[in-house]
């Protein structure tokens, strides 16, 4: 590849923010965009009827509830770097969409509420990052409130997330006594000023912690800081970039996102530490971002980003080569060449037509139903990028249509919403009632709302006695025999794959035992 392409690749950073609900993820997203010049004014994020909602929460239901229920993609420039930020759903139900977003990024920012410490959703999401050895930077948020001791927070990560921590900044006090942070490597003391435009008061570079100026500025709190830093020098892990890039160590920063404090130091370090676009695995070989031929994959489909146009956008991660507007690419699953005329880049709901894009960039392609999650596009080579799964649903509902004349609109709505991958749709081999499955319960409320709001279809959901599903594969004759014998519990999913529904774990185990010639899969990689 030309050197010019290497420069383009190396200045890109593609990352997602993960956290437990209410840890301040959407607030920090807003503040990062503020520093990147992408927005002029950050909108505090909470459920309220205000004229201004958080930039990344654009769907109608999100605006009403003040939660992020879809993953937005935002692009901005900072210090010469092109940053692609993927905002993941903040409610603890939205795991599946989030899991897939994590397949499209090269690193992750983990936001932890310093009052509550590590919470369940953070744990779940970290497991997904660990599977992929994703590098993680940690931001301890809400230092302007009384929370847990900083050393206890580090201990919490090490014990609960089984990950080594390396503090980079250290807080001076907390809550009402919060004075700022001390950078353990640059020896800068950054003062917190709630009245300042971005929360940052003056920045003081000191000769060391024995500088008498500190006693003057911090009073008795300086003893606390000296004691903490002395402890850290003996007990804390020094930052090790290689361990961070291998997903084994997380550098830790402290601050208060709502006051924009500590966010700039975090962003500066992120640019320095986080990896540029990484090589990607396919079923046949590893693709380097520096290769000349173009390639990439779809990790998300979003219907009705613009309800006025009833459109569907496929979110696409570029893995190698250069994208140019109007280029022809091979859609490998369908085995045909397609022209990508109007690709877009995103700023939440705002879109701009893209003339060119590079590895690490996320572009949107208009989708008329032919693109599915996991689809690979190349300049001719038969590749398939791996690791974009569907998870077996844990919750199920039967869909009852309130107006029988709307059955076609219902089918269209269910299939389009299922294409986004947040819910799965199942049609029984016997009977006519659709069943939808989700990894989290809130998805049912989202589907009901969106069917009514976007497709003018009113439905009721009824409970069904299923607790899990498995995708079934095997020799054709055996599969046909299975379909006959288990017809009451066999469904076809939105991808046309055979699915077995089980009413209990015992029933599932028993069925697997009885049909040893067949394979029962807990995840279905998008084909």
Swiss-Prot record:
One of its GO terms (biological process) is regulation of translational termination. GTP binds at residues 19-26, 87-91, 141-144. Its main location: cytoplasm. One of its GO terms (molecular function) is translation release factor activity, codon specific. GO terms for cellular component: cytosol. InterPro entries: EF-G-like_DII (IPR053905), EFG_III/V (IPR035647), G_TR_CS (IPR031157), P-loop_NTPase (IPR027417), PrfC (IPR004548), RF3_C (IPR032090), RF3_dom_3_sf (IPR038467), RF3_GTP-bd (IPR041732). It holds the Pfam family EF-G_D2. Gene3D superfamilies: P-loop containing nucleotide triphosphate hydrolases (3.40.50.300), Peptide chain release factor 3, domain III (3.30.70.3280), Translation factors (2.40.30.10). Residues 10-278 form the tr-type G domain. PROSITE patterns: G_TR_1, G_TR_2. Belongs to the TRAFAC class translation factor GTPase superfamily. Classic translation factor GTPase family. PrfC subfamily. Increases the formation of ribosomal termination complexes and stimulates activities of RF-1 and RF-2. It binds guanine nucleotides and has strong preference for UGA stop codons. It may interact directly with the ribosome. The stimulation of RF-1 and RF-2 is significantly reduced by GTP and GDP, but not by GMP. HAMAP family: Rel_fac_3. This is Peptide chain release factor 3. The lineage of its organism: Bacteria, Pseudomonadati, Thermodesulfobacteriota, Desulfuromonadia, Desulfuromonadales.
